[in-house]
C-alpha cells in the first residue's frame, strides 16, 4: 500500500483486455494434482524476487498512465526481467497486471521470451480485480471468478507458478467469508487444473484483513488457495503486536510467495516501519520455503530502496 493507493486509480481505468486465447501452456495436466508441488531453491539470492510495482513510474502500459512519470526513461514490461538481472543480480520477477502493455497472445509470448532470454523467471502475477468475490449480486461475483480464471490462464502461459488475486470491495457491503469462499472455491479448483497457486494478500486492510483471509482459506480448504503475507501492509492501520499475530496466521497458510518490505509511506507522507527481522523469524518458524519478493514502498527512489531490501533479506536468510 502507498499514500495514494493503486486501487483508487485502477478502479477508474480501463481493464486490460484479456485475449481469448493463450499460448505456450506448460503447467497443469489432465487431472489436477491434490496439492501443488514446487521445487524451491535454498540459496538466499535464488529465493528473492523483485516486484514491478515499485518501478511503476518507469513502466509504459495503457493501465499504468496514472503512475508513469514522463520525465523518467520508459520501460516495457518485456525488459523488466533484464533490468532486474543486470541491476540487482536476481533472476525472479513479479510483474503487476496493470504493467502489461497487452494480454494478447503475441505480447505474452514476447514477454515470456524476453524475460527468459535475460535469465529471469516470473514467479507470481499480482492481479487487481475490480469485481468483488463477496458482492451480493451473483452476476458480479461471477465476473470476479471469470476474470480470475483468465489471469490464471495468463500465468500458466507465462510459466508463472502463481497469481495474487485482490479481494475487491463491494459498495457498502462488509467482507463476507461465506460469499468470498464460494467464489474462491471455484477459482481454486480451476487453479488446481492449471497447476497455478492462487494467493491472497493482506493488502487492503478492510477487504483483505489477514484474519479474514485465513478464515476464507480455511473455509475453502483447497491447497491451491494460499496466503501471501506482506511484511508491512498491516502496519498502516495496526501496531507491531497485531502484525506479529497476522504474520503468524498468514505464514501458516503461505506456500510460494511473500512480500518483503521494511517500511511504507501512508497518508500525509507518514512512514510506517516494521520489525522485518521478526517477520523472517516467523516465516522460518512456520517452515516457509517459498520466495520473498522485494516490494519497496518507503521514501526515495526504487532502485536504492530495492537494493536496501535485498541487503536486509540476505542478512536475514544467511
Regions found by a protein language model. Name each.
Residues 2-157, 175, 192, 222, ...:
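N-terminal pre-domain/capping segments
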Residues 92, 162, 257, 290-291:
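Residues at the N-termini of beta-strands
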Amino acid at each position: 500500500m502507498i499514500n495514494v493507493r493503486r486501487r483508487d486509480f485502477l478502479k477508474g481505468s480501463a481493464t486490460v483486455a484479456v485475449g481469448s486465447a493463450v499460448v505456450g501452456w506448460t503447467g497443469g495436466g489432465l487431472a489436477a494434482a491434490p496439492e501443488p508441488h514446487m521445487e524451491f531453491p535454498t540459496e538466499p539470492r535464488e529465493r528473492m524476487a523483485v516486484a514491478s510495482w515499485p518501478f511503476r513510474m518507469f513502466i509504459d502500459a495503457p493501465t499504468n498512465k496514472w503512475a508513469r512519470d514522463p520525465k523518467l526513461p520508459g520501460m516495457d514490461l518485456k525488459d523488466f526481467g533484464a533490468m532486474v538481472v543486470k541491476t540487482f543480480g536476481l533472476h525472479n520477477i513479479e510483474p503487476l497486471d496493470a504493467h502489461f502493455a497487452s494480454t494478447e497472445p503475441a505480447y505474452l509470448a514476447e514477454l515470456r521470451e524476453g524475460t527468459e532470454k535475460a535469465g529471469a523467471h516470473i514467479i507470481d502475477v499480482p492481479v487487481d480485480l475490480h469485481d468483488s468475490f463477496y458482492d451480493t449480486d451473483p452476476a458480479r461475483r461471477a465476473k470476479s471468478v471469470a476474470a480470475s480464471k483468465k489471469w490464471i490462464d495468463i500465468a500458466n502461459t507465462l510459466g508463472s507458478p502463481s497469481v495474487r488475486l485482490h479481494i475487491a470491495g463491494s459498495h457498502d457491503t462488509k467482507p463476507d467469508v461465506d460469499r468470498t469462499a464460494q467464489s474462491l472455491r471455484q477459482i481454486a479448483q480451476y487453479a488446481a487444473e492449471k497447476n497455478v497457486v492462487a494467493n491472497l494478500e493482506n493488502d487492503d486492510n478492510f477487504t483483505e484483513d489477514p484474519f479474514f483471509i485465513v478464515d476464507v482459506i480455511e473455509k475453502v480448504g483447497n491447497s491451491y488457495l494460499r496466503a501471501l503475507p506482506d511484511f508491512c501492509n498491516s502496519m498502516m492501520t495496526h501496531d507491531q503486536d497485531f502484525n506479529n499475530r497476522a504474520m503468524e496466521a498468514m505464514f501458516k497458510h503461505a506456500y510460494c510467495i511473500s512480500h518483503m518490505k521494511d517500511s511504507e509511506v501512508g497518508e500525509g507522507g507518514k512512514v510506517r516501519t516494521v520489525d522485518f527481522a521478526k517477520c523472517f523469524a516467523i516465516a522460518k518458524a512456520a517452515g516457509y520455503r517459498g520466495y520473498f519478493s522485494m516490494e519497496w514502498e518507503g521514501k526515495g527512489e526504487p532502485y536504492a530502496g530495492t537494493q536496501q531490501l535485498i541487503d536486509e533479506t540476505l542478512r536475514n536468510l544467511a
